[in-house]
Amino acid sequence: MLTKKSAPEFSTPKFISLKDLYKNSPMSFIGAFGIGMIYGASFGLIAVFGAKLGLSIFQISILVFVNTFIGALFQYPVGKLSDTFDRRIILLILNIIALVSSICVIIFGSFSFNILLLFVGIHSAVSLPYYAVVISHLNDFLEKDEVVSASSTLTLVNALGLVLGPIIVSGFMSYFDAYGLFYYCAIVYVFLALFTYQRVRVGRTSEIYDENTPSMIVPRTASAIGMQTATEQMISKIDEKE
């Protein structure tokens, strides 16, 4: 088949092991594992949390809805902020807000159901977009042929946290009753916040990322105006030579 277009390039993706992943971005590695432990606990046992508080079935369904829907709503604004500022700073802020909201659930959650929903919603708003920011931070340090393998390895790390989270938090909920869920979350956020703060101080910044420069999408093909301008310039040069 005759065509002016070149054949697509087929290249084998570079394999990224767990060691390579941590070497590329310790923040992404620990962040994915830590937030996986949070997801496995908070999203897996939030209904159990409500049941142990003595909530009705309808109240538990509202609690589960808020815990999921509010986080989904904040995916875009948090992502926009992470594209504007240093992603490590955004991750640190998310950690701090999640830590404070977890403590507030423990202290004020028993006051009323509406207050409980408020702080669970705040926790969801900052915890659910966390993993997306972690992935974006990792991609800042990768070559094109590393993205697929690194993403799959990061998913594995996150899945390990998802598996361990419910197992560990069950012990907390057995000892501290319902609020053991958020005692557990608070402890995980403390470690994540400390590690993130350490990476902010000593970690490297991606060469392709400049927090003071807004991102710009560049088309892979030339626009019609650009093609017309280039054509006119070529014609004028030919006329000059003649």
Task: Please report, for each region that a protein language model flagged, where it lies by residue.
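Intrinsic disorder in cytosolic terminal tails and internal cytosolic loops
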Residues: 10-13, 199-242
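Pair of pore-lining "gating" transmembrane helices in MFS-fold secondary transporters
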Residues: 22-41, 121, 125
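A membrane-interface helix-boundary motif in multi-pass transporters
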Residues: 171-189
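C-terminal membrane-cytosol helix-exit motif in multi-pass small-molecule transporters
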Residues: 1-10, 192-200
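Loop-to-transmembrane helix entry/capping segments in MFS-fold secondary transporters
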Residues: 57, 142-154
